[in-house]
Amino acid sequence: MAAVEFQNVGISFGEVSVVRDLSLTVADGEFVVLVGPSGCGKSTILRSIAGLAAISAGDMRIGGTRMNDADPATRDIAMVFQSYALFPHMTVAQNLGFGLKIRGEAKATIAAKVAEAAATVGLSDHLHKRPGALSGGQRQRVALARAILRRPGVFLFDEPLSNLDAEFRTAMRAEIVRFHRSQGASMVYVTHDQTEAMTMGDRIAVLAPLAAGHKANLMQYGTPDEVYNRPANLFVARFIGTPRMNVVTLPVEGGAIRFGSQSIILPPAGACLAKVTLGQRPEHLQLAPERSDTGLTGSVEHIENLGHEMILTLATELGPLVLRQARSGKVPALGQSVRLTLDPDQVHLFDVSSEQRIE
């Protein structure tokens, strides 16, 4: 397996800059997810690893070797696409063995390798079938097995689960993670789905579009826990997490901000500012007990009952706030006046101007 390194990489198409000043390393054997909204450059970055998108600036290395101008065939990579790219007139076994046949390997060798790859992804009983007789999840497993047969240094996944329904996506997420653990392979995985990013990656690269005014694409690179619990900036705070983080801008008075009747003492980096942006995850807001005068007053505007939990949208003097909590006890009614309290240990603070995290 091989590490992948980006050093100040830029990618442009004509006068349009799509990726700017990208520096990150995918360690040997690591599973890294590139996640972000449309236009953030995630698929372009993946294509640059494969040699399908030209690098305009900086260096990209695979296994320590500079690959900017290397032919795609020499890069020792395998790619799994959103579309399965299977030959419809061939059986699963023929689809899997096609590349080996083109390379001139012996029939017995091809049969043995195909059987091994099919067993790895649970397709041993489907080798005689054509793609039209398979489910979406099974077709994606064929594509994965075909990548396995290349024995690459790096696996690339370009939104491979986007065409699957929710049940198959959940199952395939687990299968790909199990495959990574069993192979110890270096993997780079592109998705717009933060659930996939949070549940699959050893590390996550959160990317933003340059067209939105960002100076560079990479907003944060870290473990799922780091990205969720310590977002580096307001973009990451808003992008990662469902429902989205509550964000309000508050004046600083005497080194503190007020959330209704609650006072939150700021660290020195925030206490000297005129105002700060406060972020609070919906699960870290709580409904105060009845007749309590603590916190912020709000009115229940909307209730989503998910069975095991509730998501409440509340109208407050600070604007709409969303609360997420396990369903227990009495559920407030629409229009009911309630009080919200926040957990001061779970507060996120951001500079209003730079939108960077305040520690």
PLM segments and residue spans:
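ABC family nucleotide-binding domain
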Residues: 1-163
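Nucleotide phosphate-binding site architecture
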Residues: 32, 68, 87, 124, ...
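Helix N-cap at the start of a conserved alpha-helix in ABC-type nucleotide-binding domains
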Residues: 166-168
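Helical segment within the ABC ATPase nucleotide-binding domain
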Residues: 170-183
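Internal alpha/beta loop-helix hairpins
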Residues: 181, 186, 192-262
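Glycine/charge-rich catalytic "coupling/switch" loops of P-loop NTPases
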Residues: 249, 254-304, 329-359
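OB-fold (S1/OB) nucleic-acid-binding surfaces
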Residues: 259-262, 314-320
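Short aromatic-glycine-enriched beta-strand elements
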Residues: 308-312
